[in-house]
């Protein structure tokens, strides 16, 4: 006499019947991932000495990066210096533009202008950090994203 029919999933499945698995348990961590966020703008100073800085949050498992997760703050002028460094560091990659400068006669510290700039800076970093040549070959990128003591004057080309 023949055996009763059993679905293949019952035959293969060795885990308990009702145990649900998370996405990471099923698929594991992606081989190389890099997540970048620019958030939490803070305006500092007073009078004509106002400036805004932005928090950069980086999560990655790429071996070239020193830390799996980092949080640092950067000013717009830091992004400008970083972009110039990238342009000098590599001629094989077109570096995207930064969001435009806000002119002094406009209210550059209102919430709308700060949010537009934050979005533009995040887009810039996502594009730059997503480029395979920069992701693994640019020490400047890693330093800018992860080193709290980053100083553009100390960069040697």
UniProtKB/Swiss-Prot annotation:
The entry's keywords: Cytoplasm, Golgi apparatus, Lipid-binding, Membrane, Protein transport, Transport
How does the protein associate with the membrane? Peripheral membrane protein
Q: What would be one Gene Ontology cellular-component term for the protein?
A: early endosome membrane
PX domain span: 32-152
Q: Give the InterPro entries listed for this entry.
A: PX_dom, PX_dom_sf, Sorting_Nexin
Q: Give the binding site residues for a 1,2-diacyl-sn-glycero-3-phospho-(1D-myo-inositol-3-phosphate).
A: 75, 77, 101, 117
Family recorded in the similarity comment? Belongs to the sorting nexin family.
Region Disordered, annotated ranges: 1-21
User: Lineage from the top down?
Assistant: Eukaryota, Fungi, Dikarya, Ascomycota, Saccharomycotina
- Put simply, this protein is called Sorting nexin-3
Is-annotated flag, keyword Chloroplast?
no
Specify the species: Candida albicans (strain SC5314 / ATCC MYA-2876)
GO biological process, alphabetically ordered: endocytic recycling; late endosome to Golgi transport; protein transport
- Source domain of life is Eukaryota
Q: Which gene encodes it?
A: SNX3
Role of this protein: Required for retention of late Golgi membrane proteins. Component of the retrieval machinery that functions by direct interaction with the cytosolic tails of certain TGN membrane proteins during the sorting/budding process at the prevacuolar compartment. Binds phosphatidylinositol 3-phosphate (PtdIns(P3)).
Biased composition regions of type Polar residues, renumbered to the chain = 11-21
GO molecular function annotation: phosphatidylinositol-3-phosphate binding
Please give the record's comment on domains. The PX domain binds phosphatidylinositol 3-phosphate which is necessary for peripheral membrane localization.
The record's subcellular locations are: Cytoplasm; Golgi apparatus membrane; Prevacuolar compartment membrane
| Major location (coarse) | cytoplasm
């Amino acid at each position: 006499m023949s055996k009763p029919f059993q679905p293949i999933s019952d035959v293969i499945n060795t885990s308990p019947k009702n145990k649900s698995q998370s996405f990471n348990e099923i698929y594991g961590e992606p081989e190389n991932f890099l997540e970048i966020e620019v958030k939490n703008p803070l305006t500092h100073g007073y009078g004509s000495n106002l400036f805004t800085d932005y928090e950069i949050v980086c999560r990655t498992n790429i071996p070239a990066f020193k830390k799996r997760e980092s949080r640092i703050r950067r000013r717009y002028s830091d992004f400008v210096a970083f972009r110039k460094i990238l342009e000098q560091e590599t001629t094989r990659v077109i570096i995207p533009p930064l969001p435009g400068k806000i002119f002094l006669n406009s209210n550059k510290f209102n919430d709308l202008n700060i949010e537009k700039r934050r979005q533009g800076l995040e887009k810039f970093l996502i594009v730059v950090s997503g480029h395979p040549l920069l992701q693994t070959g640019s020490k400047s990128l890693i330093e800018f994203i992860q080193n709290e003591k980053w100083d553009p004057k100390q960069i040697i080309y």
